[in-house]
């Protein structure tokens, strides 16, 4: 979405806007504010398509390593995740302005709940129960006809630009293949603290998404 030169500044501006309206002194993370920005834009896309606000359900990947009370071998590999979940409930007042901090709060609360719940996992049975409960909730939401479903994944803070298989470190690392639609993948920019967001949408949705004022402002097109 952004070149590395402008990404950090844009995210800093987003965090400032969100922080101004968040209760308390906490500062949202860059992943939280970028997720919230995209979620807000997607909500506006859905309203443009359907003529009204629609409820939506967000799934965000969450790495369980170092977050659970049972030991995990340092040399373990593969996916060890249980996603954080968040909901947007459409307000009866269709004219009410939907603000960025509204989505930041929901993303933050979903992630904090996953952190809290994961800290209680101390056995294989606890882990199995937690994963099954989350997957069941996801499946139920996915089959709701009146709600939109969005899946987010973040590889931020993974040292992918330090990997060297013998022919040098990568000039650019990306997740080129994103199967399906309503899928969003975050990666660090190479040279700074920015984020690349890979967005996969239906073509009609993508056209509306690209014209969203918040997205255009964030990417320097507004």
Question: Where would I find each of the regions flagged by the language model?
Answer:
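Acyl-CoA-dependent O-acyltransferases
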Residues: 1-222
